[in-house]
């Protein structure tokens, strides 16, 4: 068995052995575990933590602490700091979504991004909400600054168009940064997202924004499994239905979600340039072991992955696996959403029609639009922490 299952022993290991290495301040009263790991969900996907480090650290000394953290595990094969996310490139900040604003960002996009933007402008010219949403999908990674370890150590980053920004200047103009780690736990790496709050700030609005974003994405992408998440939120005060939805999402289909996250982890580490062959192998082996437990999966893709394992070498393996995992992701996503349709239909029909818009859920819209768009942006890979 390669799947990572929650146990109290594992929880103690993470709290006692991992968090002291990766948190800015590891004192127990200085961090809160959020999300599914806090709820002790069986299938572990990733771990979200808020680390409150003020007043011990603020914008005058947090930079050196991040540098010390990076240096402390430079030779630690278990821990990879993929990105430090802090600051924005306000050239990509749209307020009115006017033609003038959009033309200004077009000159900063690469050819692929430009094609995507033009497609959105054409497809959603009569739907402002969706146009705004999908434009932000395209430019989000350009707007939010993602710093590699080497850029943090250098103290600077070169943006599109050759503009240089200072890490310390960015830190002074913000209140929170995100440390995006991957840590090998047992068989393969899982993600740790550490939100480091180094100035007094209320995060309620940030969490509300993130939750509302996820609600819209679940609806816009027409994916029944991910649309169960806002249903669970809606029924949070009904213990019976909430428990039923929790079981469906996290236990019945928990391995589907975990495998989707594993594939996304592979792709994220690969795209960051941090994926070595041993890490790639560990993820691939774990996927091959566990994928056979799922229903509705095209095993031809698995056969191709195994063929690459047997016949390709070195970097060629990593590249070929990345391509095949993209196909497998779509296949798993399609399967779990098809199986979830009956549950979505059952619970959406309990909600009064006047409340469905509050949940960004309208069954009629989903069905009339032609069903699920499996090629669309999906709920998991675009999970955002909006700070």
From Swiss-Prot:
Keywords: Virion. Its main location: virion. Disulfide bonds: none annotated. GO terms for cellular component: virion component. It holds the Pfam family L544_NTransf. It comes from the Viruses. The keyword Cell division does not apply. It is found in: Virion. This is Uncharacterized protein L544. It comes from Acanthamoeba polyphaga mimivirus (APMV). The lineage of its organism: Viruses, Varidnaviria, Bamfordvirae, Nucleocytoviricota, Megaviricetes.
């Amino acid at each position: 068995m390669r799947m990572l299952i929650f146990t109290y022993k594992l929880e103690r290991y993470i709290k006692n052995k991992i968090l002291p290495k990766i948190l800015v301040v590891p004192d127990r009263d200085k961090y809160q575990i959020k999300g599914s790991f806090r709820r002790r969900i069986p299938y572990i996907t990733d771990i979200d933590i808020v680390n409150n480090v003020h007043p011990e650290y603020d914008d005058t000394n947090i930079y050196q602490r991040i540098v010390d953290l990076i240096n402390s595990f430079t030779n630690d094969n278990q821990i990879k700091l993929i990105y430090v996310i802090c600051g924005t490139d306000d050239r990509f900040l749209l307020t009115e979504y006017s033609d003038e604003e959009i033309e200004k960002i077009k000159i900063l996009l690469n050819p692929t991004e430009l094609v995507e933007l033009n497609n959105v402008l054409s497809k959603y010219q009569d739907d402002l909400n969706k146009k705004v949403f999908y434009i932000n999908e395209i430019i989000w990674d350009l707007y939010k600054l993602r710093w590699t370890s080497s850029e943090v150590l250098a103290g600077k980053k070169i943006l599109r168009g050759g503009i240089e920004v200072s890490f310390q200047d960015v830190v002074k103009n913000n209140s929170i940064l995100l440390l995006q780690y991957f840590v090998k736990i047992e068989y393969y790496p899982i993600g740790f997202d550490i939100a480091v709050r180094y100035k007094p700030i209320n995060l309620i609005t940030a969490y509300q924004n993130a939750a509302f974003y996820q609600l819209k994405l679940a609806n816009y992408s027409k994916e029944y499994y991910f649309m169960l998440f806002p249903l669970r939120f809606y029924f949070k005060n009904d213990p019976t239905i909430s428990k039923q939805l929790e079981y469906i999402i996290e236990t019945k289909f928990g391995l589907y979600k975990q495998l989707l996250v594993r594939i996304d982890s592979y792709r994220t580490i690969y795209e960051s340039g941090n994926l070595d062959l041993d890490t790639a192998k560990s993820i691939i082996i774990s996927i091959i072991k566990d994928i056979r437990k799922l229903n509705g999966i095209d095993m031809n893709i698995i056969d191709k992955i195994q063929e690459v394992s047997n016949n390709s070498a070195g970097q060629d393996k990593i590249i070929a696996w990345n391509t095949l995992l993209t196909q497998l992701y779509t296949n798993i996503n399609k399967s779990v959403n098809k199986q979830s349709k009956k549950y979505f239909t059952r619970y959406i029909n309990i909600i009064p029609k006047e409340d469905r818009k509050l949940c960004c859920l309208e069954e009629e819209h989903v069905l009339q639009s032609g069903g699920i768009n499996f090629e669309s942006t999906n709920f998991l890979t675009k999970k955002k922490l909006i700070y």
